[in-house]
Amino acid sequence: MNGLQRQFLQHVVDKTCADKHNKGFSTWDQLLVMVYAHISGSTSLRSLLSRFNSHEAQHYHLGTQVIKRSTLADANRKRSVEAFKEVCDGLLQQAHRRVRKDGQDLLYLLDSTPIQLKGYGYDWAAATRAARTQGLKLHLQYAPQAEVPVNATISTPNVNDIEEARHLAIEAGTTYVFDKGYCDYNWCHAIDQQDAGYRFRHLR
């Protein structure tokens, strides 16, 4: 978590009032435990907190505490995602600045991947399902030289890749690589007009 400045996080929390109704369980606590969920590959709150709470000796150094399952469940349900979105955007901008500073010819890969959400509790996802996917779609702009993502958005699965790509700020001197899902010759022309280049990636 060294890459995330607590001062920046606190600024976001104050701006979005993320801790207003959750004073006993801060945004920092929730962020820590959900990052740990990803790292540990936990698939349920029970297994997640069993693992997380077993490291109680390290909690003090991280500025967190032992967490109850009901507390985390309530926070996941009630706390706005806005603070986490702003933190993510801030980290992506930080990565983007690092990529630009390297001074190399820039290459960006554009792609998307589905996030399946089916079964109990995911009925809401059925209304926007695509032919093969129900859930969400992650759209990613990736800098392979630095091995970091520099932009990420989430949409419903029935949103075409090109629709999200049109919102990207094209950078001069950059080459964009994408598959035929991004084929829109007007958009390709717009890339060319910004003194950038593009390549179509052939799917195997």
What is each of the regions a protein language model found here?
Residues 1-204:
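Conserved, well-structured functional cores that handle cations and Mg-NTP chemistry
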